[in-house]
């Protein structure tokens, strides 16, 4: 049984509300969007396997996806996007707060009334010839006090099937929402309406793209893209941009962080949250396998990308992974770099923009040392290693992705769906720096840790001989994802630390790491990957009050003898290469920090400028 229709501008659009939907506000909102966008029909997604299979079959028929060889990759698919729709579009991403200063200088801002007028024009009739899918989803385990619900209205079946993997999606969410529950409304269209009888294309999209957030009303509108974070609105749009503003208002944190558990041979368990910008090995670190010399240690994965953290009754910060799947970058993922990720991808995966092998499996750069002799590349063209060498063309797009259920990860933590979250013992912040920043530093206190995170960055270009690469500052790895003024975000971190300390809680320790120092020959000086466990163990020793280290201008760094070296031949001279600090380089670095602070000066917390002055004084000169 269904109920309710709405009369659109040109025809009646059946809303077809299932009897189990009791939320009048939700029904009315769906009706308003249907009236605006004029879809042929409305489908309320129940999240079932049958629904998923039906939509995947339809997309195979539509040539949006290819079914992979069931013997090689059971129940898995490859989607190839339009070449113009392959990544997040930061320059088309807007934070439309009521006041421009609330968005701040690091976000694109348009006045809300002006943006709403633009969106109304774009969305009017945008879903003609298509189906509007109502996608109810929970970010975090249903019923968790840390979780929040969203509803995405989308005309893309690709979005529906990916959201089923990436979130808890379906009827159970509507049941939890009840008659008056709160939800974040998300509207998405690929922006390509179909005329009567018009043949659809495999990957519909529009050259005009808008990814828009209204922080005060907690709304998300996305137009023109069917890809990734532009279209899966639970991910960066909700889980970071909107959730960060919710956290600011309500006293919690939404962070671009992995969460991992570490259990010692004695059974002591620790929980770490870590923020790294893109291309810095976040997923690899989340799924780390302890190296030789660490028998009896276990690292488990709670999340690989996003963390929501709320203060518990004991004053500690408790974190959940709000996602239910991994939307990971495929290139560079291989048996050497991340065997746990590869094992996660054995079945039930949607791959996007990777290459197709002759026997119906997938391949990407970094999966194997030697590419197959013949492939179909991400644009559907024949590809051979010779073509790659001659043209520089990659078989898989550099931002090609996999969407896989987190439950399939061999290293998944037993508490990954604990509704109460896990207590965080430490935060790690890291960037990709070939010089200057040492392997690991412990901040003296919360304020200096916030300073470290606020000034972190990664090199964006290959460094010329003897020169440092251009450093892109990415505070807290949140530059593209903070939904409000970055200076206010720093203040929020500082205030939360004060609040937790006032409640008598032991604050998480804060560390800065850099796995990417290079030697004189331009080679990475630290082996990285599983060997990062050696740094992690030192942090755990410090948490327990056991670890030693040497104090310097910025905090505490371990001496050679403070790390556990069993199973790795790494000399004191090699260690000096990754931990040395050049005062001249650091004076130049602090001058770059000043440039960042100048940009954010209007609301920059005094504590950060004071911390910078203290560090300069310690550094001398």
Swiss-Prot record:
Annotated spans, Disordered: 391-414
Family annotation (InterPro entries): PEP_carboxykin_GTP_CS, PEP_carboxykinase_C, PEP_carboxykinase_GTP, PEP_carboxykinase_GTP_C, PEP_carboxykinase_GTP_N, PEP_carboxykinase_N
Xref: Gene3D superfamilies: 3.90.228.20, Phosphoenolpyruvate Carboxykinase, domain 1, Phosphoenolpyruvate Carboxykinase, domain 2
Bias (Polar residues): 400-410
Binding-site residues, GTP: 279-284, 401, 432, 529-532
Keywords, comma-separated and alphabetical: Cytoplasm, Decarboxylase, Gluconeogenesis, GTP-binding, Lyase, Manganese, Metal-binding, Nucleotide-binding
Its biological purpose: Catalyzes the conversion of oxaloacetate (OAA) to phosphoenolpyruvate (PEP), the rate-limiting step in the metabolic pathway that produces glucose from lactate and other precursors derived from the citric acid cycle.
Subcellular location: Cytoplasm
GO terms for biological process, alphabetical: cellular response to glucose stimulus; gluconeogenesis; glycerol biosynthetic process from pyruvate; oxaloacetate metabolic process; propionate catabolic process; response to lipid; response to starvation
PROSITE patterns: PEPCK_GTP (PS00505)
Record organism: Burkholderia mallei (strain ATCC 23344)
CDD domains listed in its UniProt record: PEPCK_GTP
Protein's UniProt name: Phosphoenolpyruvate carboxykinase [GTP]
Reactions catalysed, as given in the entry: oxaloacetate + GTP = phosphoenolpyruvate + GDP + CO2
Subunit comment: Monomer.
Transmembrane intervals: none
Isomerase keyword on record: no
Binding site for substrate: 88, 227-229, 278, 399-401
Cofactor: how and how many bound: Binds 1 Mn(2+) ion per subunit.
